[in-house]
């Protein structure tokens, strides 16, 4: 049975990475073994009824949550990285961040045609990263069956960009 108020393990950092943005820092949650374990267990419970083959997650904090969930659920893990970080041939997507533009790269053979994918990340803010991840999965012939996030910034209305997708979040601001 779950017992922790996980929101109390999220630290607010005002004006980071730039003025006017409140950064939701999950490192206190990751540092606390009980909170981290409960967060992973609860995120896995959010998607227990979904059928998928792989967990796809972006660096850096997405790796932490995605790899832990893949291990617990007995699934493969696919890392998505920034430019120049993956050693094999990649495909990429550009996207808008809350505070700029970025690219996400994935190995061209990371997902087989028809494989079902769960996308995992730490924070759902504007939905831009999630959209780019969806495009990458589709580009390789995969099917996104669900997206799971530790934190959602609902005041930024990210779900508008993800209409038609099964979106699960644990902590909502």
From Swiss-Prot:
Source organism (scientific name): Thermotoga maritima (strain ATCC 43589 / DSM 3109 / JCM 10099 / NBRC 100826 / MSB8)
Name the record gives this protein: Adenine phosphoribosyltransferase
MF-aspect GO terms: adenine binding; adenine phosphoribosyltransferase activity; AMP binding
EC number(s) stated in the UniProt entry for this protein: 2.4.2.7
Stated family: Belongs to the purine/pyrimidine phosphoribosyltransferase family.
Main location: cytoplasm
Catalytic reaction equation(s): AMP + diphosphate = 5-phospho-alpha-D-ribose 1-diphosphate + adenine
Assembly: Homodimer.
GO cellular component: cytoplasm
